[in-house]
Amino acid sequence: MADIDIKSVNKFYDKVHVIKDFSLKIKEHSFTTLVGPSGCGKSTLLRMIAGLEDINSGTISIGGKEVNNLPPKERGIAMVFQSYALYPHMTVFENMAFGLKIEKKPQEEIDHLVNEAAKILQIEDYLQRKPKQLSGGQRQRVAIGRAITRKPKVFLFDEPLSNLDASLRVQMRVELAKLHEQIDATMIYVTHDQTEAMTLSDEIVVLDKGRISQQGNPLNLYNQPSNIFVASFIGSPKMNLIPAKLINQDKDNLELVLLNKKFQIKQTIKKELKDENITVGLRPENLHISETDDFDWQSKAFVVENLGSNTFVYLESPNGPIIVECESDQNIKTGQLLKIKFDTNKFNLFNDHDSII
């Protein structure tokens, strides 16, 4: 059993309150990613789970056992850092076996565990090489392999792919997903890369200033952010956030003015919101370029980003850029006046307190 239960944890650095009354349950065998901007506390939280940082109050339990006072080696965890932390004078085999030798494991068991991990990660041919003879991706696989040999209950990853170039990051993402399926361990992953979070995770936890802003499966966070912070953080490009005015509300419908046009949308709202300033959130893929007179708004393109498979078009608006995603074969040009149709079924509505309505 390797579930993790964090209850009312606080962490201070002098007078700075970094982690604030933080509670989180992580299911056994799940892949959970902690994301957030720099300084939000995600790496600090990971280090507290690992036992590398003390907590000021609260409890952390792994597999039903409180670990507050246990050293890292007794917590049943293994950690993989952004830095590979390999010994340059040792071979790959020796690096992977180092922790096992410290634990005085029998040589036969060491050989078995190292070779088993090497097979999983497809690095059997590199076992007698030194780290300097390996690529960045191969070195990171060795670091992960060293963690696997310990047979931990929980893997902790602290931005492990940050030092790799773009193509290697894609390759390692695939390998991490495959690894999780193979060994079926509980994994906690810290990153600022939303693509990593979206593609790897069973659950994403978005942190903001030491607190949970939202948690859930990747598609829920992407399609239904609970507040403007998550809406603007999850997704690349981020969700368009457009000020609007609510002018009428009945049991089933809302009428609002957005970019000088009235919209009536079906929305069941529990509380009365008349005359409330709201913000409409709309993903770039939910705005469409119209070739007819059936459109909601028009504006000039001032930046066109053609990515090959798709194109992002940045349009001028009184409230800043509005981004539209379209097919690359539409051949949009900078300065072109475009007619835009909104998918009102995809509107996310936020009130003036930044929370979703």
For each feature predicted by the language model, list its residue ranges.
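ABC ATPase nucleotide-binding domain helices that frame the ATP-binding cleft
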Residues: S43-L46, V142
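ABC ATPase nucleotide-binding domains
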Residues: P72-F229
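Conserved ABC transporter NBD signature motif
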Residues: G58-E66
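Non-catalytic connector elements of ABC transporters
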Residues: P237, Q249-I357
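Pre-Walker A (P-loop) beta-loop-beta motif of ABC nucleotide-binding domains
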Residues: F22-T33
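Helix-to-loop junction immediately C-terminal to a conserved catalytic motif
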Residues: A50
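The feature captures the beta-strand-to-loop junction immediately N-terminal to the Walker
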Residues: V35-P37
